[in-house]
Design a protein with these regions (language model features):
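Active-site-proximal C-terminal subdomain of hydrolase catalytic domains
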Residues: 28, 138, 142, 146, ...
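Short glycine-rich His-centered loop
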Residues: 21-37
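Short beta->alpha junction loops
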Residues: 62-71
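Caspase-like (clan CD) cysteine peptidase catalytic core
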Residues: 21, 60, 73-96, 101-175, ...
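Glycine- and acidic-residue-enriched helix-capping/strand-helix junction motifs
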Residues: 32-47, 217-222
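Signal peptide-proximal N-terminal region
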Residues: 48-61
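Boundary at the C-terminal end of the N-terminal hydrophobic targeting segment
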Residues: 17-19
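Bacterial N-terminal signal peptides
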Residues: 5-14
Length: 285
């Protein structure tokens, strides 16, 4: 009886991180409505990441790929996700696509720039058709994720992976024949002035493909480096501490893809001292 009790306790210990429903929203964009954006392969990432998540117990899964991944559709899916969440749920959000710096209108960034995800219908330059309202800036992303956090409570796990790049302060150009996610030019919004706003707290974990001064280069097969690492290493990442997980992904970067003179390293931000990104993965025998 004692042996059975110990086994039950260990099983419960392994599953404790996965209480509640496991939900996910995956967004991937390759070709954009505005031809000024370079063709990338974020759409391929989306299906690969979705498959990896299903293998790790995410049954409530929404995928937005290509032209359906407009700004309005992404916001709507975030709102649906938040509305369905319950206390203790595990929620995962993934974005593969272009990123861009844009004028920080509300003044919460010391450098004057917001980072943004680029939906399918966003334009690369400020114009009458897009004055910035089609970009998904970090303030909006924060508000959408905060709504999810409020629903799942402090017992829930909220993890985000971003296989994009902003490269706003990088002056180095990528090597020839290398596909890079992100652009050098920022989206400049004319403004008569900015007021100062408090920087919002990041109440989740965000795993990004590279640091904000680095380029995010695709692998030769078109896969995003971070997406490929997560899908390939999923079985090895379960249970790792955050620094160990970052080391594993860095090793994958170094082993795979074209040999490049431009370094790229993953980075994790948010509640790294109290939560583990690896808890999204299920331990396998």
């Amino acid at each position: 009886m004692k042996k059975i009790a110990v086994i039950l306790f260990l099983n419960a210990l392994c599953l404790c991180s996965f209480a509640g429903t496991r939900r996910a929203l995956v967004i991937g964009i390759g070709e954009y409505e505005d031809p000024a954006w370079e063709r990338i392969h974020g759409d391929r990432d989306a299906w690969a990441v979705a498959g990896m998540l299903r293998e790790n117990g995410f049954r409530n899964l929404s995928v937005l790929v290509g032209r359906v991944a407009t700004k309005a559709a992404i916001v709507a899916q975030f709102e649906l996700l938040a509305g369905r969440c319950e206390t203790g749920d595990t929620v995962y959000v993934h974005f593969s696509g272009h990123g861009q710096l844009m004028t920080d209108v509300d003044g919460d960034e010391s450098d004057g720039w917001d980072e943004s995800w680029i939906p399918y219908d966003a334009c690369r330059k400020y114009c009458p058709r897009d004055r910035g309202e089609r970009h998904l800036c970090d303030d909006e992303i924060n508000a959408l994720l905060t709504s999810v956090r409020e629903r799942i409570g402090e017992d829930g796990l909220l993890a985000v992976s971003v296989d994009a790049c902003h490269a706003g302060d990088s002056t180095r150009r990528p090597e020839q024949n290398t596909v890079v996610r992100g652009v050098y030019d920022g989206f400049v919004i004319p403004s008569s002035g900015r007021h100062r706003a408090a920087r919002r707290r990041e109440r989740w974990l965000t795993l990004s493909a590279c640091r904000d001064y680095q380029l995010n280069q695709e692998l030769p097969d078109g896969s995003g480096r971070l997406s490929a690492a997560l899908c390939t290493l999923a079985a090895e990442l379960c249970g790792l501490e955050n620094d160990e997980l970052l080391a594993k992904i860095s090793e994958f970067y170094n082993r795979n893809g074209a040999r490049s003179r431009l370094p790229q390293a993953p980075i994790m931000t948010g509640e790294t001292d109290i939560r583990r990104f690896s808890d999204i993965f299920v331990k396998r025998d």
